[in-house]
Regions:
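Mid-to-C-terminal alpha-helical segments outside catalytic/metal-binding sites
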Residues: 1-11, 41-49, 71-75, 165-166, ...
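Active-site gating/metal-coordination segments in enzymes
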Residues: 5-158, 162-165
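Short aromatic-enriched loop/helix-cap "lid" or pocket-rim segments at secondary-structure transitions
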Residues: 26-27, 126-131, 188-192, 256-258, ...
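Active-site neighborhood of phospho(di)ester-bond hydrolases with catalytic His/Asp-centered motifs
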Residues: 58, 86, 118, 179, ...
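Glycine-enriched alpha-helix->loop->beta-strand junction motifs that scaffold or abut catalytic
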Residues: 80-84, 109-114, 171-174, 216-219, ...
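Aromatic-lined glycan-binding groove of carbohydrate-active enzymes
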Residues: 115, 119-124, 163-213, 217
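Glycine-rich, phosphate-binding/catalytic loops in enzymes
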Residues: 133, 195, 261-263
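Aromatic-anchored helix/helix-loop segment that forms the rim or "lid"
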Residues: 142-158, 201-232
Length: 305
């Protein structure tokens, strides 16, 4: 909370614990279910109560067991302070547009809870049996290369596969955010997917809309990095309501305590757009209540400095 004050963050939506990036790769589905439920209870009972207005949580669900994941989603929907549930970009190398995951999407749609896709870098695993894999990781000899590629590539693959396999058409009220991979790739990826749908139409039988239409719809959102100088162009091409600020606190590549200031000073990002990206989009996306937003804005004080 002290660091949030220094950074200028009124409300934080938190992806918590290293368990989040590995639990969906466990071969033992029962263990995965128990770990997800344990972390979720810890969030609700111990972590978020430190300041229930300012701290919001992203719950974990065992996606390798879609029925159990749907049950855990129903549990999360009843917990104060949980505003989303996390999806991996793949489970055992199986992409998230696969229909085996439909029970998760159906439940998320029914309870009105947005899902948040978070990428990963590792490649340990065996297709169809265990592991959550990072695209290209097995070919990279340095972590710098792995991190630079896998996070963004995994989000691109997850978005493409969920669009192409008709997830957003089968579940028209489903909301999914793609996080921690930047936003600068969106205009390029939307154009490329449109081209491939147009020229290879028989391979997209389940898709009822152009990929760019889905990317610009209220069904999907993305997070940006505070240093993305192309952000104004992204908002022009994809839409102002699609992108939310993310601090990436407290990873090695975060800009703490200057990320809010950095984003606010991006050339071409006017005051209205700053307000939208820094707060309004997240308030709408995560269904935050007005009474949960502090009256005396920490961000306002920081930006005034």
């Amino acid at each position: 909370l002290k660091d949030m004050d220094e950074e200028g963050i009124d409300v934080a939506v938190i992806f918590g614990t290293p368990v989040a990036l590995t639990v969906n790769g466990l071969a033992d589905k029962g263990l995965a279910q128990a770990m997800c439920h344990g972390v979720n209870r810890w969030l609700v009972e111990e972590y978020l109560p430190a300041d229930s207005k300012r701290l919001k949580g992203v719950g974990l669900i065992p996606c390798q067991d879609p029925a159990a994941a749907a049950t855990e989603l129903e549990f999360l929907a009843k917990q104060a302070g949980i505003v989303s549930a996390m999806l991996p970009t793949n489970v055992y190398g199986i992409n998230m547009g696969d229909r085996r995951f439909d029970p998760i999407y159906a439940t998320a749609q029914d309870i009105g809870m947005p899902l948040s896709v978070h990428p990963q870098t590792g490649h340990d695993g065996e297709y169809g049996r265990w592991g959550v894999m990072g695209a290209g990781s097995e070919r990279m000899e340095k972590y710098a290369y792995v991190h630079a590629t896998a996070f963004t590539f995994e989000l691109q693959i997850a978005l493409m596969h969920m669009i192409g396999e008709g997830v957003f058409d089968r579940f028209p009220r489903l909301k999914v955010a793609y996080t921690e991979g930047g936003a600068g790739w969106l205009p390029f990826w939307a154009e490329r997917l449109d081209e491939h749908q147009e020229k290879l139409r028989p391979q997209w039988p389940d898709l009822q809309r152009r990929p760019s239409e889905i990317i610009a719809s209220e069904q999907v959102a993305f997070t940006c990095e505070p240093e993305e100088r192309t952000l104004p162009y992204v908002l022009d091409r994809v839409g102002e309501t699609q992108v939310m600020y993310a601090s990436d606190y407290a990873h090695w590549d975060c800009e703490f305590p200057n990320s809010v200031r950095m984003l606010s000073r991006i050339e071409g990002l006017d005051e209205r757009r700053r307000s939208v990206v820094l707060g309004q989009n997240a308030i709408h996306w995560f269904n935050l209540k007005p009474e949960d937003i502090p009256a005396a804005s920490v961000a306002g004080r920081v930006l005034a400095v």
